[in-house]
Amino acid sequence: MLKVYIETMGCAMNSRDSEHLLSELSKLDYKETNDPKIADLILINTCSVREKPERKLFSEIGQFAKIKKPNAKIGVCGCTASHMGADILKKSPSVSFVLGARNVSKISQVIHKEKAVEVAIDYDESSYAFEFFEKKAEVRSLLNISIGCDKKCTYCIVPHTRGKEISIPMDLILKEAEKLANNGTKELMLLGQNVNNYGVRFSSEHAKVNFSDLLDKLSEIPGIERIRFTSPHPLHMNDEFLERFAKNPKVCKSIHMPLQSGSSAVLKMMRRGYNKEWFLNRVEKLKALVPEVGISTDIIVGFPNESDKDFEDTMEVLEKVCFDTLYSFIYSPRPFTEAGAWKERVPLEVSSLRLERLQNRHKEILEEKARLEVGKTHVVLVENRHEVDGQIVGFEGRSDTGKFIEVTCKEKRNPGELVEVEIISHVKGRLMATTKNNQ
């Protein structure tokens, strides 16, 4: 039995790709290990959305090269592999092969070649997306429904690393979802770069279907209790989508709405396809349909030419929406993007101050929202149990609206159970609860 160690960086799509890599390698008698020192194969599944993870890659390669077995191979996979290709081999001689994000199913071929590079982004591996393999039962499972991206946001490298957007045929998705349900999955996380644009283009001729249709079909699968998805695009959140999202009882009432900027001028420079008013209108419509909805977002500060007024527009949207989760970053220039070639730059010290102000205000908002949760009840999907000296003391999980809740109780609750809990306190935005009968 050979051993493989996988270091996964970045988004949920990368996590699913790592599962796919394990699926392919299991056919070659590889088994996953958590110790790179004993691995016969070390894979680094990379992210390139920002510069920092790329810099980390070469540090990781150096560390693994020092501790690996003499004959162990190191492979670099994912988005950084897609856009750097053979340059990775030049910079790091200890790397044996490079495998792009659109070429995951070729892993069994490249591990037998020395200095192989497979990074074509026009390779259609949608038919390989669901190589199901036996694994321990998971309460929450990742499920690809599309690959690639057709959007041309001026700051984003993803279209260059993952290629054109292709929707995976619905029959394949439903078949995989049924297998996951039979393996113990209670909650699906659907994945795609523009997940709610599903159905626009398939790899071959298929019946016309949209994202809401897919959600309805997945909801009919016995055993699946909850469905989440990431990452949707605000541009595709039309009235029909929002109304069907609200009506489907199995679709969790939490949604990611990546704002990126609250300034219409900056959004135009980013080529996002919507403006501030459109975004706020979508939020207003959504909250009218689902008042308790949980909304998360992405925000970039310090985008080229972002003025003080532009940043204040972002702060205004933050105040109006009161996002439940905020992923915020200083703009990072990326190769192969339009904005990456622009000479105008917001000084780092200005961007840093803006980010600090944004994040500090969001922390205050979370405290305010957490305080209002005390006394409310939620149904939580149990994810992990807490034990002390062999005694059950509680569990943790997420509510339908995406709130992460730590629960104290004496009775045994198994992962996958749905349990009604009452919020009793909060600490720095974290919610604490007990079961309704306080057992």
From Swiss-Prot:
Keywords linked to the UniProt accession: 4Fe-4S, Cytoplasm, Iron, Iron-sulfur, Metal-binding, S-adenosyl-L-methionine, Transferase, tRNA processing
Residue numbers binding [4Fe-4S] cluster 2: C149, C153, C156
SMART domains given in the database record: Elp3
Family annotation (PROSITE patterns): MTTASE_N (PS51449), MTTASE_RADICAL (PS01278), RADICAL_SAM (PS51918), TRAM (PS50926)
Principal subcellular localization: cytoplasm
Cellular component, GO annotation: cytosol
Superkingdom: Bacteria
Top-level class of the enzyme under EC nomenclature: transferase
Family: Belongs to the methylthiotransferase family. MiaB subfamily.
Protein name: tRNA-2-methylthio-N(6)-dimethylallyladenosine synthase
Native organism: Helicobacter acinonychis (strain Sheeba)
